Amino acid sequence: MEGKIIFICFLVVLLTLPELISSEVIRKEIPYKKRKFPYKSECRKACATAFTGGDESRIKDVKPGFFKCSCYYSSG
């Protein structure tokens, strides 16, 4: 019984490992000249255009800053 539990745990870890590796989140900043503190929606569009070819579904999070946007997006 104990061997089966260890095997199942090993199998679950093995199956989830490729997804964790392939979904690396990258953080980059881009300048935003139109507004001193841009809205999140403006940052999301700017990040999608700059890093993912317009694909907003790959943008995980954005954080507006002083004339900049911090972009968190998935590589794959």
UniProtKB/Swiss-Prot annotation:
Expressed by the venom gland. GO terms for molecular function: potassium channel regulator activity; toxin activity. It is found in: Secreted. Keywords: Disulfide bond, Ion channel impairing toxin, Potassium channel impairing toxin, Secreted, Signal, Toxin, Voltage-gated potassium channel impairing toxin. Its main location: secreted. Residues 1-23 form the signal peptide. It comes from the Eukaryota. Contains 2 disulfide bonds. One of its GO terms (cellular component) is extracellular region. Belongs to the scoloptoxin-15 family. Acts as a voltage-gated potassium channel inhibitor. This is Kappa-scoloptoxin(15)-Ssd3a. It comes from Scolopendra dehaani (Thai centipede). The lineage of its organism: Eukaryota, Metazoa, Ecdysozoa, Arthropoda, Myriapoda.
